[in-house]
Amino acid sequence: MESFAYILILAFSIGTLFFAIALRDPPKIGK
């Protein structure tokens, strides 16, 4: 079960990093 927790934390960190980048640099796809 430790692997599941590790994957969950890894996915959360990646999601947070992606969210921070999205906030810092607004997506230009809609324009």
Curated annotation (Swiss-Prot):
Bilayer-crossing regions: 3-23
Organism domain of life: Bacteria
Pfam families given in the database record: PsbT (PF01405)
Major localization class: membrane
Membrane topology type: Single-pass membrane protein
GO-annotated biological processes: photosynthesis
Keyword Ribosomal protein: no
Example of a GO cellular component annotation carried by this entry: plasma membrane-derived thylakoid membrane
Record keywords: Membrane, Photosynthesis, Photosystem II, Thylakoid, Transmembrane, Transmembrane helix
Cell compartments where the protein resides: Cellular thylakoid membrane
UniProt xrefs under InterPro entries: PSII_PsbT, PSII_PsbT_sf
Subunit structure: PSII is composed of 1 copy each of membrane proteins PsbA, PsbB, PsbC, PsbD, PsbE, PsbF, PsbH, PsbI, PsbJ, PsbK, PsbL, PsbM, PsbT, PsbX, PsbY, PsbZ, Psb30/Ycf12, peripheral proteins PsbO, CyanoQ (PsbQ), PsbU, PsbV and a large number of cofactors. It forms dimeric complexes.
Function: Found at the monomer-monomer interface of the photosystem II (PS II) dimer, plays a role in assembly and dimerization of PSII. PSII is a light-driven water plastoquinone oxidoreductase, using light energy to abstract electrons from H(2)O, generating a proton gradient subsequently used for ATP formation.
Family: Belongs to the PsbT family.
Protein name (Swiss-Prot/TrEMBL): Photosystem II reaction center protein T
Species: Synechococcus sp. (strain RCC307)
Gene: psbT
